[in-house]
């Protein structure tokens, strides 16, 4: 006799909500004002990777030495990737355990890398992977993961009064022309992302 079991995850009440803003200098900045710094695994291994890659390029393709060196380069890349995954799994688990709902922007990380020429920085950041890990960890626990539209002007809105102003890429502080509120631009953006997620959740 065969039995089918359906795993139903009970939805948790949404009380504690966190907004995450992508940061070029860090992994992310959150709506609580916390900054998550990211170990730069790729940059830490970049010189060694380049050195081993140069050795490989000088070898005769198909030779035993070439195959050995190719495997060595592949293992180095795999090691860096595994370091990144381990860190992001731990970080996403910590967030998923602490919050009922997490809100992020639905930004295209690959397009951003090409458009702003962030190549290596973005390769080392892992924010896109973190979002994926958060999504399934939260949803497996009956919690919410929400993406706000990529065109949502999170950096332009004053989280204090709702006024809107354009802000340059080099401006690190948001100063509202209407109410005078002053705040770190990334924290202000993370709070706006959080609030927009709450609005979307409530419908």
Identify the role of each PLM range.
Residues 1-203:
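Positively charged, helix-rich recognition surfaces that bind polyanionic ligands
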């Amino acid at each position: 006799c065969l039995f089918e079991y359906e795993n139903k995850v009970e939805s948790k009440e949404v009380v504690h909500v966190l907004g995450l803003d992508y940061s070029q200098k860090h992994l992310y900045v959150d709506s609580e004002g916390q900054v998550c710094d990211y170990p730069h695994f790729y940059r830490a291994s970049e010189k060694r990777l380049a050195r081993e890659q140069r050795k490989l390029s000088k070898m005769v393709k198909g030779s035993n030495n070439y195959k050995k060196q190719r495997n060595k380069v592949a293992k180095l890349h795999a090691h860096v990737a595994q370091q990144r995954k381990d860190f992001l799994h731990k970080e996403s688990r910590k967030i998923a355990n602490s919050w009922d709902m997490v809100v992020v922007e639905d930004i295209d990380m690959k397009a951003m890398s090409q458009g702003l020429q962030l190549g290596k920085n973005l390769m080392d950041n892992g924010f896109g992977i973190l979002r994926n890990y958060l999504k399934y960890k939260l949803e497996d626990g009956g919690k919410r993961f929400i993406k706000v539209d990529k065109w949502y002007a999170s950096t332009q809105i004053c989280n204090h009064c709702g006024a809107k102003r354009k802000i340059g890429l080099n401006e690190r502080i948001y100063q509202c022309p209407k109410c005078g509120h002053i705040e770190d631009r990334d924290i202000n953006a993370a709070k706006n992302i959080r609030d927009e997620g709450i609005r979307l959740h409530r419908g």
